[in-house]
A protein has these predicted regions:
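A structural signal for short hydrophobic beta-strand segments in well-ordered beta-sheet cores
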Residues: 112-116
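Glycine-rich beta->alpha junctions and the first turn(s) of the following alpha-helix
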Residues: 182-263
Length: 263
């Protein structure tokens, strides 16, 4: 199952963690292992080749990965969160993206930049940040308000600007290699710019309303934010558990000056 697969990948991560942090890259062997083990599509619907695992299994798998390396666990959680757009897409669009076994969507959070409505779809322009996993991505996305032809934002039923997601192949975005924080260098949470990229209506969606889903089932009855929180918690719990193991090992070996060993 997913938990055992994650534990096996985590063994590789422990050996490669220093390299990931130093190079700010995942070794090809790690990327291949994530793809082969299905770690990047645990939350993807089964009809698109995903695992469609329950939230508890997903949580334990992310915890196991985080014990090996925080950057990899983070990117696995982000990739799975992005895969949650699949139930909201037309079937042909979802297959176009996820029939590739290496499929991975990377994107940054909405930052207020809107996208104009044009005939047949949208014209995307703007820059976004924190696109974790963009170096392994096959597709990228952007989120923001929809700007109608008259220049006004499209409103949701609550009277607020409707936030929509636009998807496009990774080569249509210009990525900026700017991510370099201690401890999570490997996530490649870089910035990116999109210039005059046309996105057809079928490759755009909003994840705000469960009734818009094309695929139902127990997993997709959860809100996107609810499952997002499961992934964040898994990364934090796995890192904390690994830290405690290392601390106990250090405490058992360290000898304070003038005193016997602590354990």
């Amino acid at each position: 199952g997913a938990i055992n697969a994650a534990a096996l990948v985590a063994r590789q991560l422990i050996a490669d963690a220093d390299e990931i942090e130093e190079t700010r890259r995942f070794p090809a062997t790690i990327t291949d292992a994530l793809i082969a083990s299905g770690m990047l599509r645990m939350l993807l619907p089964k009809v698109y080749g995903g695992g469609e695992v329950d939230p508890g299994t997903y949580l334990q798998a992310v915890i196991a990965l985080a014990k090996g390396d925080g950057s990899v666990a983070w990117n696995v959680f982000v990739a799975n969160s992005a895969a949650l757009i699949a139930p909201f897409l037309p079937e042909t669009s979802a297959h176009a993206i996820f029939d590739d076994p290496a499929a991975l969507i990377a994107w940054g959070p909405p930052n207020g930049q809107g996208t104009k409505v044009v005939e047949g779809g949208y014209l995307v322009n703007g820059s976004w940040d924190f696109a974790s996993g963009c170096r392994q991505a096959t597709w990228m996305g952007a989120h923001g308000p929809v700007i109608e032809a008259d220049g006004n934002p499209r409103l949701n039923p609550q009277g607020k600007p409707l936030i929509r997601t636009w998807l496009f192949p990774v080569d249509q975005a210009e990525r900026h290699d700017v991510w370099n924080p201690i401890g999570l260098r490997g996530t490649a949470s870089d910035s990116y710019t999109v210039r005059d990229v046309f996105v057809a209506e079928d490759f755009s969606s909003t994840r705000e309303y469960l009734e818009d889903r094309q695929i139902s089932g127990p997993l997709y009855a959860f809100t996107m934010q609810g499952l997002y929180a499961v992934g964040v918690a898994g990364v934090a719990l796995g890192l904390a558990q690994a830290m405690l193991v290392d601390f106990r090992a250090l405490a058992a070996e360290k000898t304070p000056r003038g005193r016997p060993r602590l354990a």
